[in-house]
Regions:
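Acidic catalytic/metal-coordinating carboxylates
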Residues: 32-36, 59-62, 86
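Positively charged, aromatic-enriched patches within helix-turn-helix-type DNA-binding elements
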Residues: 154-231
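Short hydrophobic/Thr-rich beta-strand motif most characteristic of the beta2 strand and flanking loop
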Residues: 25-32, 40
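Receiver (REC) domain active-site loop signature in two-component systems and cognate sites
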Residues: 55
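Basic, amphipathic DNA-recognition helix from helix-turn-helix-like DNA-binding domains
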Residues: 64-65, 69, 74-142
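Active-site beta3 strand of CheY-like receiver
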Residues: 44-50
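Short, Lys/Arg-enriched segments at the junction into DNA-binding effector domains
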Residues: 3, 114-182, 186
Length: 234
């Protein structure tokens, strides 16, 4: 049973959402401001955080920033404002996904399950004959000094922890497993975020940008992956 921390100041909303998600099999804990959420994370482990953007005491964006300073667990942001700036800022700070209120209950549950799947298992890959990576029986994946451990969801570059979020880990893993192949934004959105790509949806682009910032320069001077305008990533 996945443990979910819901951080939202709307008491009536949290009661309804807790009832819904409990029926879906999630174990829920609710707090009503960002500071309470940070304190809860200090003392207990959770599989996913649902974080409201507009809150008193400490806003959702500021709470997310402090979460990312210490934790890599997935965060799904909720907001009554479908504001593109809020969405981009949240993704830049490391949110795994963003759902505007009011939302379709089934869509929210699907997004949550997609996040949890990608933080506990490897994404699907396509077959290719010549592989320039090594994957051994301990489920580690190696390429150009980067080593990924699927079971532990940990990534290293030359032995140093890369401190990736669950979404960044899954994205890097899929790119490494399909090195040399063009992966479209549509495919990455579906496989990594669990949703179809919509017009003006830049979630994948923001996750790629965050991943690039965390990866050091390769010793051979080559880019980790290339952006192919209108086609995807290579």
């Amino acid at each position: 049973m996945s443990k979910i921390l819901l951080i939202d100041d709307d008491i009536e909303f949290t009661e309804l959402l807790t009832e819904l998600l409990s029926l879906e099999g999630f174990k829920m804990k609710v707090v009503h401001n960002g500071l309470e959420g940070l304190n809860e994370l200090e003392s207990n482990q959770y599989d996913l955080v649902l974080l409201d953007v507009m809150m008193p005491v400490l806003s959702g964006v500021k709470t997310l920033k402090r979460i990312r300073q210490k934790y890599s667990l997935p965060v799904l942001m909720l907001s009554a404002r479908d504001d593109q700036i809020d969405r981009i800022l949240g993704l830049e700070l490391g949110a795994d996904d963003y759902v505007p209120k009011p939302f379709n209950n089934r869509e929210l549950v699907a997004r949550m399950k997609a996040i949890l799947r990608r933080t506990t298992s490897r994404p699907a890959s396509t077959d290719h004959s010549e592989q320039n990576y090594t994957e051994n029986i301990s489920k580690s994946l190696q390429f150009a000094g980067v080593e990924l451990h699927s079971g532990r969801q940990q990534a290293y570059y030359q032995g140093c922890d890369l401190d990736l979020t669950g979404t960044e880990f899954a994205l890097l893993q899929m790119l490494m497993r399909n090195s040399g192949e063009i992966l479209s934004r549509e495919l990455l959105s579906l496989k990594i975020l669990g949703k179809n790509l919509t017009p003006y949806d830049r979630a994948i682009d923001m996750h790629i940008s965050n991943l690039r910032k965390k990866l050091p320069e390769r010793e051979d001077g080559l880019p980790w992956f290339k952006t192919l305008r209108g086609r995807g990533y290579l």
